[in-house]
Amino acid sequence: MLDTKFDELMEFPCSFPYKVVGDASETLADRVVAVVQKHVPGDYVPSSKVSSKGTYNSITIRVTVQSKEQVESLYIDLAAIEGVKRVL
């Protein structure tokens, strides 16, 4: 796991925003939702934005997380998606 202080800074459960930045792809949002569904099943409608040159997409999704471990494992799994450059 990651060495974070989420448990010291946040009260769980809480709504947590993830921003996933990756190569421009029509399927990036679907792949992000699929990963989130494995951890926290639910109905998600992520917002998407294309960079000014069309090179990258950013997907923002809010997830109700239950623990520090859930926040961290989502960071790890979202970063493992093919084409993802950053998870914020």
UniProtKB/Swiss-Prot annotation:
- Entry-linked InterPro entries: UPF0250_YbeD-like, YbeD-like_sf
Pfam families (UniProt xref): DUF493
The record's Gene Ontology cellular component field reads: cytosol
Membership in a protein family? Belongs to the UPF0250 family.
This chain belongs to the protein called UPF0250 protein Swoo_3713
Protein species of origin: Shewanella woodyi (strain ATCC 51908 / MS32)
